[in-house]
């Protein structure tokens, strides 16, 4: 991303009416609940959200932006076509956590030379974007902290992304720290507690969670959110002290 680029009596109901009422009530009560997975403890809180099943775009919408490219599912991945300049997808879910969670996904740049899966996600009451391959193809970091973009703040890293290659990203968010890995290699850990956390205007339409490309065609798959354990939260807070 460059500086210039870039939801009284008692009355008895008939049996059929009562059943219908109960069914509607149950549907309302369960709407929007996370899908339980094999990783969730029986009877306990849901610990993992599967945000993309590899088959369709349920739970997602095309991000509206100027001359945005198309979005489709192909070979088990969401393909985001190149736009003029940006394209993207945005989650329509209302049950996303805002802290003590891990967002993980796999992404590749199919063509182009800029960011191909910039991921916007919740951080407490705000949001931030992980840029991957911005500013000409290699800058990786958070936009924005204290108004400084990924190319200007302490999270800036230079990563060489090869077109056609899948990369695995993991981002963990706690009340104090945002920590990132690429292909299981820690990229950065930053304490944001006393910093202003905010997205750039260009990725604000990806809130609460979404992905964006810049003059590049990208693909995203295996999108999940997992709640962190107490041990992981403690480890994250220590990681930012190094």
Name these PLM-found stretches:
Residues 17-27:
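Bacterial N-terminal signal peptides
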Residues 30-242:
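Carbohydrate-interacting regions of secretory-pathway proteins
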Residues 6-7, 28-32:
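Coiled-coil-like amphipathic alpha-helices with heptad-repeat character
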Residues 1, 18, 146-148:
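A short alpha-helix capping/helix-coil boundary motif
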Residues 1-11:
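N-terminal secretory signal peptides that target proteins for export/translocation
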């Amino acid at each position: 991303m460059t500086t210039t680029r870039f939801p009284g009596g008692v009355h008895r109901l008939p049996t059929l009416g009562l059943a219908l009422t109960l069914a509607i009530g149950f549907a309302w009560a369960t709407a929007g609940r996370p899908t339980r997975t094999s990783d969730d403890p029986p009877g306990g809180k849901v610990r993992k959200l599967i945000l993309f099943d590899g088959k369709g775009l349920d739970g997602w919408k095309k991000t509206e932006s100027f001359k945005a490219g198309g979005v489709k599912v192909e070979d088990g991945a969401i393909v985001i076509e190149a736009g003029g300049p940006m394209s993207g997808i945005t989650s329509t879910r209302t049950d996303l956590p805002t802290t003590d969670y891990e967002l993980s996904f796999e992404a590749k740049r199919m063509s182009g030379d800029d960011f191909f899966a910039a991921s916007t996600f919740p951080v407490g009451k705000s949001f931030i974007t992980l840029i991957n391959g911005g500013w000409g193809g290699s800058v990786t970091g958070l936009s924005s902290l204290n108004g400084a973009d990924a190319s200007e703040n302490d999270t800036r890293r230079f990563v060489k992304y090869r077109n056609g290659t899948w990369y695995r990203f993991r981002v963990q968010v706690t009340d104090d720290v945002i920590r990132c890995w690429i292909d299981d290699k820690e990229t950065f850990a930053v304490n944001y507690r006393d910093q202003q956390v905010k997205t750039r205007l260009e990725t604000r339409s990806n809130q609460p969670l979404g992905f964006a490309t810049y003059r590049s065609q990208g693909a995203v798959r295996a999108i999940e959110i997992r709640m962190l354990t107490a041990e992981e939260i403690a480890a994250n807070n220590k990681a930012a002290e190094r």
